[in-house]
């Protein structure tokens, strides 16, 4: 169970991000515990007259949005959403990200790339000097063995993520396996992202380095405040 301070920080970040949404916007809705608070605040703002459409990045988010009464659309209808709100596992000083602990990284990256603005909501624990550790990577099941071998040649220690409350590997909303590739300190995230992406059979990597120019980071604090970077 999370501590109250951490929950206050997440709520503060999510609600601050929801305040950045303007009437009439199409909003990419990320996946995760901090985005949940943004969605709850957006639902409250709808009752105050806000009109929005949401594009969910996972089944979980779509279900939650419907429960909250947030009307949904698709990238087929709205290929260039105004803004996307999402979480992250790590954020460095250059606003480069590691994402994918929730196994929704592929759709999150598609929406992040399409959106005019990307707002990342995190608590202070997610802010790091340098990206490091596990990089979630979605992989076609057919290509699992050669992808694992290729990741090892890049210096990673890849592990197929196992499911919880199910036997066998985690299966993404797209039908892919999730491989957690441990890299240690990532000195050149752009280079590592390109190298992983070029491996045949990789669907998506959790390194997000191409969107720093349109990214704002909302950092929640345990006292219930939030600041925008």
Predicted features by range, described:
Residues 2-86, 212:
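N-terminal active-site beta-alpha-beta segment that forms phosphate/nucleotide-binding
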Residues 2-5, 59-229:
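Conserved phosphate- and dinucleotide-binding cores of soluble alpha/beta proteins
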């Amino acid at each position: 169970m999370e501590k109250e301070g951490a929950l206050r920080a997440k709520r503060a970040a999510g609600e601050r991000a929801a305040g950045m949404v303007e009437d009439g916007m199409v909003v990419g809705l990320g996946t995760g515990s901090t985005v949940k608070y943004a969605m709850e605040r957006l639902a409250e703002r709808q009752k105050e007259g806000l009109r929005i459409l949401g594009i969910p990045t996972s089944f979980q988010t779509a279900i939650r949005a419907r429960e909250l009464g947030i009307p949904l659309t698709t990238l087929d209808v709205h290929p260039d959403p105004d803004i996307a709100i999402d979480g992250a596992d790590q954020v460095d000083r250059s606003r480069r990200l590691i994402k994918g602990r929730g196994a929704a990284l592929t759709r999150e990256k598609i929406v992040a790339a399409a959106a005019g603005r990307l707002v990342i909501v995190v608590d202070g624990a997610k802010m790091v000097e340098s990206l490091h550790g596990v990089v979630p990577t979605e992989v076609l099941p057919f290509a699992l063995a050669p992808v694992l071998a290729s990741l090892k040649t890049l210096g990673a220690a890849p592990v197929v993520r196992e499911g919880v409350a199910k036997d066998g590997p985690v299966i993404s909303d797209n039908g892919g396996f999730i491989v957690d590739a441990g890299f240690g300190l990532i000195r050149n995230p752009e280079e590592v992202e390109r190298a992983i992406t070029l491996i045949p059979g990789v669907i998506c990597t959790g390194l997000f380095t191409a969107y720093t120019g349109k990214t704002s980071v909302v950092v929640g604090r345990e006292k219930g405040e939030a600041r925008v970077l």
